[in-house]
Amino acid sequence: MSKVRLVVVGNGMVGHRFIEELIERADPGRYEITVFGAEPRPAYDRVHLSSYFSHHTSEDLSLVKPGFYDKHGIRLLLGEAVKKIDRSNREVHSNKGTVVEYDKLVLATGSYPWVPPIQGSQHHECFVYRTIEDLKAIRSAAKSGKSGVVIGGGLLGLEAAGALKALGLETHVVEFAPVLMAEQLEGDEEISAEDV
């Protein structure tokens, strides 16, 4: 019996967990696995991304044990974003020209930050807070900056604000809801700027 060609698009927390579970549950050697990851490093813990500013390294945040992909015969294509899925020919095409055929396809692309369509949002010093590369860029910009503004007063926005403050910037949070963490808190609970 030939191996099932499985392509996983996305090497974030969910994509990596899927692969771990598949390896644990599937018959050994059943799948020929290829994983596309748009970022330049293997899966890492985004939940604790803010700890990167407190002297943790990208290796500290890694979810991948050394040698994991080689041990399981997984082809990992880092820095390759999928640009096209050809369902008729069952092919995945990357931004680097790699074409991989599949029998089974898993899309584990995660989420993307919403950037409000406001003037200046495309400026080179306007950042999102999603990847280690984003945090590296924020840290670099903070070296010559005096203040920073975070748009969004939810949990991640407040984490970003804490990071800017820790980098020595005067920090401001802009939130569209009448209270901070509106999505996380219920009813009578409320956090104001004075509480932060």
What are these regions (language model features)?
Residues M1-V7, V64-V149, H172:
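FAD-binding core/adjacent interface of flavoenzyme oxidoreductases
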Residues S2-R75, A163-D188:
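Beta1-alpha1 glycine-rich phosphate/pyrophosphate-binding loop at the start
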Residues G10-M13, R130, I151-G154:
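Glycine-rich Rossmann-fold phosphate-binding loop(s) that bind the pyrophosphate
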Residues G15, G157-L158:
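N-terminal Rossmann-fold NAD(P) dinucleotide-binding loop
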Residues E20, K136, D195:
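Active-site phosphate/pyrophosphate- and oxyanion-stabilizing loops and adjacent acidic/basic residues
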Residues V128-T131, G157, E186:
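Short, conserved glycine- and acidic-residue-centered signature motifs
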Residues E186-V196:
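Extracellular/periplasmic Venus flytrap/periplasmic-binding protein
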